[in-house]
Amino acid sequence: MSINAVDSKKLVEALLGDLRLLSQEAKKKQNHVKESAETGVVRIRNISTASVGDTVLITNLRAACTELLHPLVLACETRHTRLVQIALQGIQRLVQHRILSGNGATIVTNELWALVEAECEELRVLQTVPPLVSSELIVTGNTLAKCVVMCFRLHFAKDPIVINAASAAVRQLVSTVFERVIQEDGIFSSELTVVNPSGGRPSPRAAPPTLRPCAADAYMLFKDLCLLINGEAPTWLVGIQEMTRTLGLELLESLLKGYPSVFIRHTEFGDLLKDDVCPLIIRLFSPNVKAMHINSQHPSSRISNASMSNYPPTVSHDRQSFPISMRLVRIVTLLVQFYQNILHTECEIFISTLLKFVDGDRKGWQRPLALESLHRIISSTDLVKWMTESFDCRPNSTHVLEQVAVELSVVVQQCLVCTTFSSDQDNELDRSQEDGGPGFLVKGLWVPYVEHLTSKKTILLDSLDRMDAVAISEGYVLSRCCVALCDLTQAVYAVIDRLCVLDENCEAGSSEENLRIAKVAYANTQPSILAAIGSLLAASTDEIVSDQLLCCLSTLISAGCRVGADQDLHRSVYVLAIMSLPSPSYLNQFAGIPPPSPVSKREVSISEQVFDLESWPSTAQVTATGPPCPCPVVSTDLWNKQVLLTSKNLQAARTFIASITTHIKELNGLWYLCMATCEHLSWLLAMRPTQIGQFERETRDDHSNGPTVVTNAALGDIGMLSSLMDKVAPAIAALPNEEFLLVVDALIRLSDESLAVAATGRDSSLFPLAVLYRVCSLSLSGINVFWAKVANHFIKVCNHTSVSMRDWAAVALTSLAKHAIKSKTSMDPKSQQEMVIASLLALCSIPHIQVRRRQLDCVMSLMQTDGSSLLSTSWPNVIQIISSIIDNDTGCELSLVRQGYLGLRLVSSDFLQSIPFDCISGLVEAISRYSKQNTDQNISLSALTLLWTISDFIYRKMESVGNDASEAVWMVLYTCLSESCVDTRFAVRKSACQTLLQTVTAHGHALRAPAWHHVIWQIIIPLLDKVRSQTRCASTEKSNGELIMHHSRDTEQKQWTETCIHTLSAISKIFNSQRKSLLALNDFGAVWEAFLGYLDWAACYENAELSLSAIRSYQEVLLGKISSQTLNVNSHEKSNGSESTLDTVAPELPQAQWVESWKVWLRISRGLARQGCAAVANSVNADTKSTSSTPRMNSSTSSLTSLAPGVYVPGPSHLTAILHIFPPLFDKVAKCITVDDLKYESLPAVLESMMNVPIPSEQAPFVLPSSTTHLTPTQEALLEAVKIVYVECTISGTTLRTAIPDQIRLLLKFASMATQRISPNKVAPGGQKSYRDYALTAIVPFSEYSLRIAIEFFTSTSQYPDVSNSLIAINIIKFLGEPLYMKYTCISASTWKLAASSLMSVLRTSIPYARQNPEVFRSLWSTICDTMERWLFTPNKSSRLAADERKRDELMECQAIEIIRNEMLAYASRLPQEDVQRLISLLHRGSISQIDSTDVLDSHTQRNELAKACFDALLMSTDGAQAGAEEDDHRGILGNVAVTSLLQRCTQVMADFCKDWSAAGDLRLPRSRILEIISALQAIDSLIARLARDPRMTELYSQLVSLFPSVVDVMPCCHADGQLEQQLIKTIKSYQTLFLLQNIPQSTV
């Protein structure tokens, strides 16, 4: 401490004044004092003069301290009062200005000790000692001890003034000693220096060597104080003879309270506490045997039984017990408050001792005294935290905090137990209640409440000046416990709050440990506090006291919320809840919410004391009465029971609502309990929610189960409760997401219960729905958290049977939706609008019309008011809401459908340009739904019109939105149209098909190739599937509807058939127009195959219209717009240099698809033919099948007069259409197919079967042949198909050449139709003319043309080995035998003539090749013989035939004989013998028997030319007789046989004629006989002429000579006929030539 200039000058002047005064007073008797004083004056003056500056002056004065003290000490030694006073004054100045040195301090101390011994100026000595000790650290050790001892001794002086001053001085000195320790620690703030002892054990009379001087002094002082209190002699304070125990305890208390840092910083002092103080306190607590037991429990106790027995007895034990006990309790309180960290075990013992005092109050003041101490302890947050950490958190330690709480609770319960109840108590109870004082009432026991009690304001602990305990008022203990419990609750909450505050620098492990400590503190105190508070609250009769207890309960709830103690918090909330309701069992009895079950023994008391009460004390005012809120989980009998609500219930209700509002974030799973309590409160107080979710007082309806009566006194509370309840919703709205959802769940659960009650027809509470609506309306900023769950619940309520609740929920949901759309939230506006509108969409599942109408009203309102603000993603949901009206569950109510369609039109008209393009797909789907609804067909048709309008809009938007977006919408549009194409209503289907075709036609080119993949597989193919399925399953029954329909559409079958026709036609056009895009598909092959499959099915379907349409679609999809009249038959011949016209017109198609199309063509053709054959089989007028080998007449040139019911026959138009496809199709696949496809079993068989399809009678009149070819279109198409195949087979290098014979066979089949025999009952198609006439115009031309083509094909390709080796020539010759046999019986004579010419062509072509391959064609010769025989000798004669015609026919026969003679007989050696013999026989027969008796012209009765030809052939064969050496013997034998046969025949004819002529007499023989003999004579004449040309035929010569007699025999008969006579004369004259032969060769025979 520095001294400024003014102070130093004043000090010098004061010292000089004191010395002068001392010199004056001592000059009479104390001369040595006078001299010394004068010397001091001189010394001071010299120092003052010599010192420059104040600092130097002070330093010099301190250096001369001893000299300055000398006169003052001498004055004190004189014991003269005045001199002593002056000297002590001077010493005080030196001490005050710190001029005194250490030696000077010792001198002063010794002199003061002497004065005390002399009892001189004791008061002034007491004034000097404290400054001396406290000024500087110059008084230490024994010097300091002397100072302290002096004050202690003066404390026991006789003068009261001295005693009081000494008492103050003692306290000051003791405090100064410990303050010096603090100063010393501050100076040496570094680590304490440990002084190693010199050796041996430290002396018990000295301080530990590790302490610094000041600390050592304090150590010795404190230790001696303990010794003095314990009645032992001090070791440092030598000279103290006596000291009262109360003073010692007070000094200990002051030191322990004032300087805790000293005891904590220095372990030596801590050891003093453990070794001296604590055992001392324990002994003083129990000076009897019990104290021995307690003392022995302390491990550090140094007090022995002997020391206890040696303690001098004081005054009466009972009298001195209270002041000492009171001070001991104060010290114990201090030890626990300040030294708990170093005295764990001791503090535990002290608290246990206090609890023992509380448990057993034998003197009346021990329990309140201990309660006051415990109250101070548990009011400290730090101490509560310490007890929790040190004891309760340790597993094997005593739970001190828990014991304290339990003991307080036990005291409360004991105080509320009434052991006896007398009339005096009854009177006192009445007086107390009349006085209106606060108190507690339990079962007739009245306990008053002492007000204004705090932990610091105590009665017994503050009685330091009293020897006896003051009188304790009744109810003090219970009141103290009540306040202590409240303070304990606050302390526990403070501890929890401190531990739960997150420290940014705190590690994770530390945070978890803090939370664990907080949980233990709460768990160990909550049950006891709750039990006590619950009991006190139940018994309280004062509003203020009840409010304090409710506040405590609320704090307990707050603490539980902070630590997350769910079970404990549950019990606390439950207690507060039942306090708010009419009875403790109300929740369990009327709400079905049982009290939480105790999980430990200490919790049982809660149930026993609070929950099990039948009713609350009846002192509170009744505010309301009525029935409880109905709950479905309890018996319905309880719904009509009357309950009472009191003012204390309302007070608790206010706290309850305020508490849950305050701690709303931590209630977690207790929200159901809280909301149920609020619901019952609102019900009991008739608080009804308004439409906006707020509460107000209303009167219950008359029809309810007993009205609720509310007193006027409760109206104010109801208003406050309404206000508090209204604040719950905003508080809930501010909750975090998870907690908010818990509240929502609880409200939904309560709402479900209300729904269950409403289902019984009873009035139910609207509280849950109101609060839920209110909460959600205030939480729209966090809509993403709750919306889904809340909306689902409202939707559930909307589906309830209660009309009012249903309507209320619908209004709530739609109102929330309207506000939610406009709310500003953290959500993405897109997601927000989607979520809100999705909830409106969920209402679509509600079948109630009113709910749906409110839904539509809401949507319409949104569009009208906020339509421009709707985001792109919201429009699809809006549209879907409108479209969802079309649903079976609602029965498609007409008003809803119309209202919904108005909304749809509003979107399409007002928002089509503004809504995002990606919403158009949803709009299209919505419109499609309305087009499918069955309620109003006009709306359906109008909806399809909207689709067409939207398609134009899409097309206009393509450039701005891009191909991807537009294609996506196109897909939806096409899908919807395709779905409408299979609508059950024909008008809708037709309109949809037209719209689909128009849309694709107008805008289909907008799609890119990838999009077509989706169109094909997801739209077109499924559409075709559905149409096919419906067409198959459609009913054939006529419609009985009200509308009059045309006969062509009067059945579902007919309607679906037309739909199928439209669909196939439309899709075919799509395939053609979009061929380029479709070809870009990777799976175009599969697409093509699938579509052709549908065409195949439709073409073969048993419906003429559908079949023909499918065939035309098939033609169109293959050939484009090319006409069937422009087909190029000879495409191969005209495609050498440039591409043909067909190729330029036909759509592009890969080769694989052409092959697939070829296969489909075959299948369709077979199917059509198969249907025609089936019709023939089922025909009721089928012709009898021919037994011959000729084909039947059932062909495309025949007809069916009648068909069996349901039998379908493809018409000529079907066959013609499919055949017109063949040429271009075959041109594409000719290079890819195999020869097996052209074999007779494949393509020719198909063509043949198609030719066999009959013509329906109704179509026959319209089948007209061509004016040029005389063929019907079908026949032309068939022959053109064959020609196409033939041309392909004749191309050089082709592999199909082996199929030529099969094509010829097919043509022969066609040609055979002209040889069929006509039955008498055969009717021409249409029945207009005879069948023969019909055949002449429709059958014969086709057959003859087929035959010509066949012969042409054969003659042109016979040089091919594949054709010649196939033996097709045999088939042709065999076939030609039939018309040649029929000859004049054929339908047309041109047929057999064509056959004859064809035969000759075939013979000319095939015989030369056959001669070269005799083995291969072995059967050819017999076939030729058969055919010739059938032709030349047919029994079928013409009835009328002109001579020239017969000559022409005979000429043809001669030509055939000529071919046989030149091609066969000329090479007879190469032919089989039997076939040659047969030929000779035929010639023989032809040469003599060719007579036609039916000829009217006698001059031409014989076929002379034929006979000549036969004779010439026979005669030519006779050349073999002269072959001899030149040719083989076989030929010679053949000539001899021929001649012999001829001559024998002539001899027999002449002999028979002569014989018959003689026998006939005058009768003339038949003309045939005359002609026969004429032929024989002619043959002889021919032989003679032959012999004349070749005289070497000796055998013939002999035979002719032998025949001459027979010729002569004819002469008598020649007069019968002139012609015969002339021929006979000619023959006889020929013999002249024979006889005149000059050189007759000799016969070798």
From Swiss-Prot:
Keyword field: Protein transport, Transport
Residues annotated as transmembrane: none
Domain of life, per lineage: Eukaryota
Pfam families reported in the protein's UniProt record: DCB, Mon2_C, Sec7-like_HUS
SUPFAM superfamilies linked: ARM repeat
An individual GO BP term: protein transport
Stored InterPro entries: ARM-type_fold, DCB_dom, Mon2/Sec7/BIG1-like_HUS, Mon2_C
Function: May be required for traffic between late Golgi and early endosomes.
Family: Belongs to the MON2 family.
Protein name: Protein MON2 homolog
Species, as recorded: Caenorhabditis briggsae
